[in-house]
Amino acid sequence: MLKIVLKALLIGKKSLTLQFKAFDMKKTILIAMSSAVLLFSSCAQEYNRVYKSQDYTYKYEYAKECFANGKYSRAVGLLTELVTIEKGTENAQESLYMLAMSEYCLQDYESAAQYFKKYYERYPKGYYAEQAKYYVGESLYASTPEPRLDQSPTIQAISAYQDFIDVYPDSKLKDQATRRMFELQDKLVIKEYYNAKLYYDLGTYFGNCTSGGNNYQACIVTAQNALSDYPYSNMREQFSILVMKSKYQLAKMSVISKQMERYEDAQDECYGFLNEYPDSKERVTAEKYIEGCKKFIEKHQKDPMYVPQI
């Protein structure tokens, strides 16, 4: 009986100890949370005091501290005012650069591009001029859309990088800027491919051909322009496939007076494709088209209805 009582007392003691430990843990957490709230409140009060201050030197130093510690939102709030108030002073140049970089770090790339551009325009010989010129391109690069969308921002980014390379041909950032340009050009190539492929897929549909012509002709023009504009693209074969297929389909749907000429053109295109891409996955298609063109030409080459009149 005594053993049972002692065991019960021991269990109770352990339970009480655990309860005290749990209480101490909760107390520690509450103290930590309270301290964090007080610290945040204190920091917020300090920021508000600085923000309302007319001591612009103090405000500038506080903004630099915020920037250095990664508190970019607070830095922006102070620097936006300082770049106007301190215009023409020693601190104005660094304030504008920190503002631009803060916006960049906050992923407000449109504002960042504007401020970096403004910095370079105001201080073309400034301490951060090279970085600012480069980050105009970086800001535009970061905001470029995926290839299916309008690529105007992509063209602007390419132009910005090219401007940077022209102004700083010996910069350590030149190679990175060049890589960015090639990457963005690839995006333009993909956009052109989507456009050409869309025309091909629309095929004989005329609802979108309000200015005459047809979708196969539009596909051919778009793809050939891309081949001319981007001669080193790794998508040359894809564009060539679209040209070949479109020329064959165009010949099939043409009026009698144009069919012979277009079948001959399609046949030449297929031969050219096989010469350039002998191992293409579309080799069988090209050979099939050549056979179709030959049959048509042999059948109608003496028929005056199909032979163009000179």
Segments from the language model and where they lie:
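Acidic, polar-rich low-complexity tracts and alpha-helical solenoid repeat scaffolds
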Residues: 6, 11-12, 17, 22, ...
